[in-house]
Structures are given as C-alpha cells and as structure tokens.
Amino acid sequence: MSGPVDLRALPSVDQMLNAAAVSPLVEQHGRAVVTDELRKVLGEVRLAVRSGGALPGKDGIVAALLSRLDDRSRSNLRPLFNLTGTVLHTNLGRALLAQEAVDAAVDAMREAAALEFDLDSGGRGERDSHLRELLCELTGAEDATVVNNNAAAVLIALNSVGAGRQAIVSRGELIEIGGAFRMPDIMERAGVDLVEVGTTNRTHAKDYVKAIGPETALILKVHTSNYRIEGFTAEVPGAELAAIAHERGVVLLNDLGSGSLVDLSRYGLGREPTVREAVAEGADLVTFSGDKLLGGPQAGFIVGRRDLIAEINRNPLKRALRVDKIRIAATAATLKLYRDPDRLASRLPTLFMLSRVQAEVRAQAERLAPQVGAMLAPSGYAVEVCSCSSQIGSGALPVDTIPSAGLRIVGSSGSALEALAALFRSLSRPILGRLRDGALVLDLRCLSDEAEFLKTLSEGSGDAVA
C-alpha cells in the first residue's frame, strides 16, 4: 500500500511557465492569462491529491491547462447547427446573411468609409443616403430611413408624429412581441395616448371614424404577424383605412412587423402583405424588420411620406437608434439582391432554406441517416428518417408550417434523450434539435454543410450513453 503523495513534487507555477510545452501558450494567450489558469489547475491538482488522487506529471498538467485555455478563449456566441425546424429562430440570431452582405460588412469593418461624408461636395453627408434610394426603389415610397430594429422604428415614428396626442388602434392588433414587449407599452414610451376601437375579433370602419377627434394624430395599423384570429372576424383593409385617415387629416402608420419585399407565394410559402402593397394602399408610414423575412441584418425600416420621414430624422431619438456602417453595408448588399427576384431564392439564405422542397430535405436525411446511426448505435441510440414540419419563426406566418424531413433519434428513455440533447449542445459546434414524441428530432431544412455536421457529431458520439 503506497503512502501519501508528497505535494512538494508538484511543479511550481514558475517551473511550469518555463516548460517548453507552455512557452507557446504564453505567446498565444499572454503571460497573465496563462499564469491565472495555471494557478487554478495546480490548485485543483492539490485538492485531488489530498482526496487520494494520483499526482499527474507535467504532461497531464499541460493537458489540463490547454483545456482551460480553450474554454476561456471560446466565444459563447459561436456557430451552431440550427436543426430545430424554426428557420428564423429569434434566440439563434434570425436571418443568415448572403455572402454579398458578409463581404460588404467585412469591407466596412476593415477600412474607413464615407458613412456621413459627401464625396462630391467634400462636406458632411447623410447616413441614410446609402439605403434611401434602394428602399424607395423596392417599396415605391417617397422617402426612407433606418434605425436599429422594428420596435425602434415604431417607437420613433409614433413619437415623431403623435407625441402628446392620440393614436387609434384596433383591439385585435394590440400585440405582444418577444420578451413581453407589448404595443401599448411602446406607445406609452412614445408619448402617445392609446385609443382602442372595435373588439378583439371584429373592427369596422365606423369604429375608426367615431374615434377620430381633435386630439387624434394617427391611426396605427398593426399586422398581426405572430398570431392569427380565425372564424367570426372583420378588419378594415389598408386602402379603406388610408381613405378614412386622409379625409380627416390624420396619419396612417402601418406596422408590418416581419415585413416582406416580395410575394412569398411565388416560392411556395404563405401569403404575407408586402411593403410595396402597404405603400400603394396609401399608408403614410410603413415600418418593418430587416432580419426576418427580408433576410438581412437587424434593422428597422421606415418608408413613406417625405415630410414625415424628415420629421423622424429631426427627432433626437434618431441618433440614439441609428445603425453603424457595418450594418448599413450589409443591408445595402442584401437589398441589392432584390433587384433580381428570379435569382433571389438561390442567393438569399433565408429564402433558400424556406423554399427547399420536402423531397430534397428527405434525400439529405437518407444520405446522413446511415452514418449518424453508425455513430450512435454503440451507445444504444437508433436513428431513422422521418417527416416533420418546419416553421418560419420570428412571428411570421404563425399557423403555417412547411413540410420537411429529418433524423429521428430514439433512446432507452426520456432521460437518455435529454442527456443526448445536452451532449449535442456541448459540442465545439453545438447541434440543436427538438425533443418531441419520445425522440430527438433533427430537422435538416437548415443544414447546408453535411461534412462539418458529421465531423462535429463524431467528436461527441463516443460520449453518448442511452
């Protein structure tokens, strides 16, 4: 029986820092960081030895140090495989950018750019000038501006047009968006007084007409993109609402939420109102998002009457809500893709993923199932190809689903599947699926890099236990 381990045999921090295997780590991570992590490793070794553990050699200490440094340098905001079946997943960053947008953003990051500089006159320029012409071309609006998201767009539009006055909204359109942000709360922050009309399921033209008075600044129409009321319902069409507003000298603000620049039905998806249609119907201002159906970076767009856009741009909030050169560059590159609608689905990742037919996704699942099954079988998991349903996400077309396909993984118990899902989340590139009906389902609609997926999966398959 061996006696107690002599901790004096444990190398000191200085000895380890001078070791040949540690010197490159100091060069890579910095002496202060390596020293800090090395002290933690040696502290853990002392505790383990005092509890009866063996004293590791220098190689073991270096391995533990490497592991800690890797964990420390790894970003939590790292790429992952979104196999949840929700294409525009709010918690996973929504839209993936087109390569043209990525390239434009990188160029803007690397060099100085004429963000607010007029190269013709040599004087101060406008930040919006890089997007105004594109937005007006694609929507038919007189003018346009951009802020950092659609909630900000609604906030500043309401504040600019209606602060201290009333805004009329149908009760059926008082929505709540993600994170418990409610339209009445946004209106309160904007400084407008909410006037509710109609009922939850039915609002008529006469309800708006009756509510308009001397203190009315605007009518707010909100596209209920994240839910749908069906059955005994009625709402006032945008064109009719515009006529009511204009006859009585008030502004019509139409918040489209997700917002689409093209008719999605041509790509086999459900019908969503387009921004151009809202402008043509007579809305004075239209707000919509950049990182949802449009497929660009996060942004909130406001298009409409030139005088109202000018008023918004004079609002002190505009500076607080403005976007930087990186997002402007990526947004401009994204918008330019819409000039060629025939090739849009092949160039815009969001639209490409949404428009993939089920047969194509199923063929991908059939290619991958044998390999994934072989990796997980030793741990007691079975893999089969399955049909499933994808959804758009981010509040767009909430009741519409898209026929899809994927891999259905079953184990010995529900706890085994939860353990497998946790293992997948811990991989160098996490794999996210969804647990349902006694299985872990990986919807492959959003999987583009099969080789990287298999490589990542192989890293953790040996640790899976059913």
Curated annotation (Swiss-Prot):
- List cofactor names only: pyridoxal 5'-phosphate
The subcellular localization recorded is:
Cytoplasm
Pathway note: Aminoacyl-tRNA biosynthesis; selenocysteinyl-tRNA(Sec) biosynthesis; selenocysteinyl-tRNA(Sec) from L-seryl-tRNA(Sec) (bacterial route): step 1/1
Query: One Pfam family of this protein, by short name?
Result: SelA
- Which key words tag this protein in UniProt? Cytoplasm, Plasmid, Protein biosynthesis, Pyridoxal phosphate, Selenium, Transferase
Catalytic activity, EC: 2.9.1.1
For this protein, the record's Gene3D superfamilies field holds: 3.90.1150.180, Type I PLP-dependent aspartate aminotransferase-like (Major domain) (3.40.640.10)
List the GO molecular function terms.
Answer: L-seryl-tRNA(Sec) selenium transferase activity
Q: Which SUPFAM superfamilies match?
A: PLP-dependent transferases
Reactions that this protein is recorded to catalyse? L-seryl-tRNA(Sec) + selenophosphate + H(+) = L-selenocysteinyl-tRNA(Sec) + phosphate
Q: Give an example GO cellular component term for this record.
A: cytoplasm
Q: Does the keyword rRNA processing apply?
A: no
What processes in GO biological process is this protein linked to?
A: conversion of seryl-tRNAsec to selenocys-tRNAsec; selenocysteine incorporation
The N6-(pyridoxal phosphate)lysine modification is found at: 292
- Reported function: Converts seryl-tRNA(Sec) to selenocysteinyl-tRNA(Sec) required for selenoprotein biosynthesis.
Family in the record: Belongs to the SelA family.
Q: Which PANTHER family does UniProt cross-reference here?
A: L-SERYL-TRNA(SEC) SELENIUM TRANSFERASE
What is the official name of this protein in its record? L-seryl-tRNA(Sec) selenium transferase
**Organism of this sequence:** Rhizobium meliloti (strain 1021)
